[in-house]
Design a protein with these regions (language model features):
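Conserved Radical SAM active-site core
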Residues: 39-40, 45, 55, 64-124, ...
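Iron-sulfur-associated redox domains of electron-transfer enzymes in respiratory
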Residues: 106-317
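Gly-rich Lys/Arg/Thr-decorated short loops/hinges at beta-loop-alpha junctions or inter-strand turns
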Residues: 2-7, 30-33, 76, 94, ...
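Ferredoxin-type iron-sulfur electron-transfer modules and their immediate structural context
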Residues: 1-52, 56-59, 63-66, 316-317
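A short local structural element in Rossmann-fold oxidoreductases
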Residues: 25, 70, 100, 196, ...
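Transmembrane alpha-helical segments of multi-pass membrane transport proteins and ion-pumping complexes
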Residues: 14, 18-23, 52, 98, ...
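Short, amphipathic alpha-helical segments
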Residues: 2, 6, 14, 18, ...
Length: 317
């Protein structure tokens, strides 16, 4: 990455007035025969030179990861190396997408998972409802493909979503009866991190209900305490959430990692027989992956749907 955020372009005329040199309080700018130059070792990226230039020859050069972070968790150290502050990071994953060099990546547990399988332990995959939109193959065939990777069982997290719906509905009704002005859902780990780290005043309005991943993992562990639970998740946030529940959620893999496993093992999803869906899962449980899915599920099961008036936050911005 660039060491400083401001550069002099070829629009510079090496003018006589040289306002940029006077604006810089660190003496970082020198003017040659054709244009000015900024010394990256002296520059503190204050931007005063850019503001002073009448030709707009000095521009701001953004660092993609820093610019993409919505909470200012990424910055350079004294050596110019980027670092992510875990006290600020909400694990939204925007920096990973923004970095053109692929320098930011998630911690992977794939080797750990296969070690558990090799040791003969019952490794159970917990699949998020959004997986259905990630592959061209039928959703049931994708579930079969996951089983062929060596998992002892494949459980839909939509099962836990039903429990989340019931508990969140009851909590919402109780809060409204007590006079609360509103309540937010609690399933998105990045939202929860944002509240805890940057908006603590909002925490009183957030539902205390666990996410579907937690309830699904609890159910698996209750049936078989020896089971190793692996969440197949759509986002970086789920990995951070799993760290809060290490006793029931053992590992997390992303959809990208799942696709890599299919390719590495040469599993042709289209050629597989589709796995049957769990008949105990209500339709609204699979709708959690959609925008306002949690709220719509609560609304659909509420005694009086008109009590639920949703306000939707769509997207990371």
């Amino acid at each position: 990455c660039v060491k400083n955020k401001y550069i002099v372009t070829n629009l510079c005329r090496a003018c006589v007035a040289r306002p940029c040199t006077y604006a810089c309080k660190k003496g970082a700018i020198t003017v040659g025969e054709k244009q000015a130059h900024i010394d990256p070792e002296s520059c503190v990226s204050c931007g005063m030179c850019m503001d002073a230039c009448p030709f707009h020859a000095i521009i701001y050069q953004p660092v993609p990861c820093e610019e993409s972070c919505p909470v200012g968790a990424i910055s350079k150290d004294e050596h110019g190396v980027e670092h992510i502050d875990p006290e600020k990071c909400i694990y939204c994953g925007k920096c990973m997408v923004a970095c053109p060099f692929g320098a930011i990546f998630e911690k992977t547990f794939m080797i750990d998972i296969f070690r558990e399988m090799k040791a003969g332990k019952p490794v159970v995959a917990m699949v998020a409802p959004s997986l259905g939109g990630q592959f061209k193959a039928d959703y049931g065939k994708v579930l079969t493909g996951i089983k062929k990777l060596g998992f002892a069982d494949v459980v839909e997290v939509a099962l836990g979503a039903n429990i989340t719906t019931e508990k969140e509905r009851e909590e919402f009704i109780e809060r409204m009866e007590e006079g609360a002005s509103f309540m937010t859902t609690s399933c998105c780990p990045s939202w929860m991190n944002l509240v805890r780290k940057h908006m603590p005043e909002m925490e009183q309005y957030v539902s205390t209900t666990y996410s579907p991943m937690v309830y699904t993992a609890q159910g698996i562990k209750e049936k078989n305490p020896e089971a190793i639970t692996v969440m197949v998740a759509p986002c970086v946030g789920k990995r951070s959430e799993s760290y809060l529940y290490r006793d029931i959620v053992d590992y997390v893999i992303s959809y990208e990692e799942l696709e890599a496993l299919f390719k590495a093992t040469e599993i042709d999803l289209e050629s597989l027989e589709p796995m049957e869906f769990d008949p105990n899962i209500a339709g609204h449980g699979r709708g959690f992956a959609m925008i306002s899915g949690v709220t719509q599920s609560v609304k659909a099961t509420a005694p009086d749907p008109n009590v639920v008036k949703e306000v939707v936050i769509d997207g990371l911005n």
